[in-house]
UniProtKB/Swiss-Prot annotation:
Record organism: Sus scrofa
Protein name: Inward rectifier potassium channel 2
Gene3D superfamilies: 1.10.287.70, G protein-activated inward rectifier potassium channel 1
Gene that this polypeptide is encoded by: KCNJ2
Span list, region Disordered: 384-427
Post-translational modification: S-nitrosylation increases the open probability and inward rectifying currents.
Pfam family, one: IRK_N
CC annotations in GO: membrane; plasma membrane; T-tubule; voltage-gated potassium channel complex
Extracellular side stretches: 107-128, 148-156
GO process terms (BP): cardiac muscle cell action potential involved in contraction; magnesium ion transport; potassium ion import across plasma membrane; potassium ion transport; protein homotetramerization; regulation of heart rate by cardiac conduction; regulation of membrane repolarization; regulation of monoatomic ion transmembrane transport
Length: 427
């Protein structure tokens, strides 16, 4: 859409660009109107990167420095460690220099810098700026070597010693609080929370479902863990307003409560593609030509600190594998369950997965194959794949190639020979 905008206030830059927009169906933002364009669009820039960082840059922010300084504690917690250490070192050094200058001025005005003067000094043994600076360090850090000390000759010197002690305590408290807050941030907890590299679409309980997998690499639990997802897609409203990133909620069981998960072993999050889903009208070919991004979010409290953490990732349209399922990772042993994370990102192709949209499937425009034959074909596919990998020594792949001449609405299923069948969970 960016190619048809010449300035920030116009949508159509010329008559030719207007004709281009007229060929697009903008009713729901996915190009599912009467005129469809099945050319693969240029891969969009991610709004949320795979590691969870948002791909956003702020420009032309008014009074940015003042706003950040007004919230200096959050600024210190958010910045990198090296800048944090630089700021804290400067805070100490500048405070020592400031009070060193104050004590040097007191000594200068009182005449303590004159070695021939025999009167009582405000600060004993402070007869130069270096001595005043060392006295400032000893006062703020409570070192107290004993050579330099304040006397009762000058009340202003006594007041400055008390004031510097208070300032030193405030700086220490601020630094300790900021360091502890930065160390306790649950941001690093996200390093042990992982999402699958690809999302998949396959049949589950007779319905097309969008699925992705999430896992916890630590044995410590994520308390009150729950998931949510949004679909980001640019669209044009019926009034002609261009929305670069329209956010549409994807239901993962919020109403029924199944969005709350017990994340001990890897779990597959399921979004049922029903009439309320933004993917309801999309077939495999539509998704192959679509330009959208699905942002997935996992939230919960870290068990050790009780602080809330949020882990994010995203899937572009070309990262959604149609007709695939995830390989099993949880296996039951004699006295425990074993999780094999080497299979976490691997998928296998499911035969006879409908290539039509969920709407066409609901309206009976697609003939589903027998469920038993599905289980048998699935078993054969997995068995042959494992045999080939063991013979050739080739790692398992997640091929997404599909025969090009398959009809989206009428796929014939070849009847299989009678064989003893096994459940899919036993494969």
């Amino acid at each position: 859409m960016g190619s048809v905008r010449t300035n920030r206030y116009s949508i159509v830059s010329s008559e030719e660009d207007g004709m281009k927009l007229a060929t697009l169906a903008v009713a729901n933002g996915f190009g599912n109107g009467k005129s469809k364009v099945h050319t693969r669009q240029q891969c969009r820039s991610r709004f949320v990167k795979k590691d969870g960082h948002c791909n956003v840059q702020f420009i032309n922010v008014g009074e940015k420095g003042q706003r950040y300084l007004a919230d200096i504690f959050t600024t210190c917690v958010d910045i990198r460690w090296r800048w944090m250490l630089v700021i804290f070192c400067l805070a100490f050094v500048l405070s020592w220099l400031f009070f060193g200058c104050v004590f040097w001025l007191i000594a200068l005005l009182h005449g303590d810098l004159d070695a021939s003067k025999e009167s009582k000094a405000c600060v004993s043994e402070v007869n130069s700026f270096t001595a005043a600076f060392l006295f400032s360090i000893e006062t703020q850090t409570t070192i107290g070597y004993g050579f330099r000390c304040v006397t009762d000759e000058c009340p202003i010197a006594v007041f400055m010693v008390v004031f510097q002690s208070i300032v030193g305590c405030i700086i220490d408290a601020f630094i300790i609080g900021a360091v502890m807050a930065k160390m306790a941030k649950p941001k690093k907890r996200n390093e042990t929370l992982v999402f699958s590299h690809n999302a998949v679409i396959a049949m589950r309980d007779g319905k097309l479902c969008l699925m992705w997998r999430v896992g916890n690499l630590r044995k410590s639990h994520l308390v009150e863990a729950h998931v949510r997802a949004q679909l980001l897609k640019s669209r044009i409203t019926s009034e002609g307003e261009y929305i670069p990133l329209d956010q549409i909620d994807i239901n993962v069981g919020f109403d029924s409560g199944i969005d709350r998960i017990f994340l001990v072993s890897p779990i597959t999050i399921v979004h049922e593609i029903d009439e309320d889903s933004p993917l309801y009208d999309l077939s495999k070919q539509d998704i192959d030509n679509a330009d959208f991004e699905i942002v997935v979010i996992l939230e919960g409290m870290v068990e050790a600190t009780a602080m809330t953490t949020q882990c994010r990732s995203s899937y572009l349209a070309n990262e959604i594998l149609w007709g695939h399922r995830y390989e099993p990772v949880l296996f039951e042993e004699k006295h425990y369950y074993k999780v094999d994370y080497s299979r976490f990102h691997k998928t296998y192709e499911v035969p006879n997965t409908p290539l039509c949209s969920a709407r066409d499937l609901a309206e009976k425009k697609y003939i589903l194959s027998n469920a038993n034959s599905f289980c048998y074909e699935n078993e054969v596919a997995l068995t042959s794949k494992e045999e080939d990998d063991s013979e050739n020594g080739v790692p398992e792949s997640t091929s997404t190639d599909t025969p090009p001449d398959i009809d989206l609405h009428n796929q014939a299923s070849v009847p299989l020979e009678p064989r003893p069948l096994r459940r899919e969970s036993e494969i």
